[in-house]
Amino acid sequence: MQIQLRLNDFLFNSGMLGFYRVLEKAEKLSFVSFDNNCMKIDTKALEEFQKDYIQAMLLEYEEDTKWKTAIEKESIIQNINVEEQEAEEKIETEYKMIKKIMESASYKSGYEFIKQIDNYDPYDEIEKIKKEINLNQKKEKLLNIISYLKRHKETYCMKDIIYTKIRLFWENVSFLNKNANKSDITQEYKKYFLEPIQKYLSKDNKSDYTCIECGNPVGKSESFGMAWLKDVGVDGKKKTSVFWNYTEDAILCPVCNLIYSCVPLGFTICENQGIFIN
């Protein structure tokens, strides 16, 4: 099956570019073709797209994360000579930095998910380091925490990316829903953005409602609003308006909803500001 999407307003276009970049990084561009302003997508491109999305985010933004900062401390800690006069001060500096990162709210929520599959407790280790006198033991325990972070890169690195990059553009749904912040990030993305597409494409859609972006019919129960998009969307259920004659028409089909989730990869982000040339 093939999906066709046309270039539209700047934000949707940035989402299309972001979607393209996900497929590019996943080496799936063979499933995409172009005809003037139309992007044609083979639905095979959506298989395991949730994993492709997460990996694209990691590849694009990993270098600018607290996770990366912590990981880069590994060689520094390993090279501290405990016989040096400054050794204790150096270890204390690295300890404070890693402790600060681990005690952030986003990392604590990540731990709540990870502890279901990994019984190592980094917070217990942090307390042990605080009480430890032996410098070699302090080093070893710090390196244990870094090894733990490396094992769970997808969770911790993505936590940084979610709150410093993705949240610039959208919020309150999927893994940014306040009730899902302790859940598996990949599965939350799949559940909110991909499973509705499978259901939508599996049946013949006939409806009085049409998607505001692609114009395809979409049932009210299968549609999505735009309130989750930062500074753009309006929650039509909470705010009626004479502007649309009290009948909301800002409705998205599941496919276009997915495209908007890719907006953070369509922009170039510098100093918490997004840049996109339409």
Label each PLM-derived region with a short phrase.
Residues 200, 209-211, 251, 275:
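A broad, low-specificity signal marking well-ordered, structured residues that form hydrophobic/aromatic
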Residues 1-209:
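N-terminal alpha-helical interaction blocks
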Residues 207-208, 215-243:
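Short recognition patches in nucleic-acid-associated and regulatory proteins
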Residues 211-215, 253-256:
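Short cysteine-rich clusters marking metal-coordination/redox-active sites
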Residues 24, 225, 266-270:
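General "foldedness" signal
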Residues 181-184, 223-226, 248:
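N-terminal start-of-chain detector that recognizes signal peptides
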Residues 233-278:
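Domain-exit/linker segments immediately C-terminal to small folded modules
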Residues 197-201, 214, 218, 260, ...:
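Hydrophobic, Leu/Ile/Phe/Ala-enriched alpha-helical segments that form helix-helix packing faces
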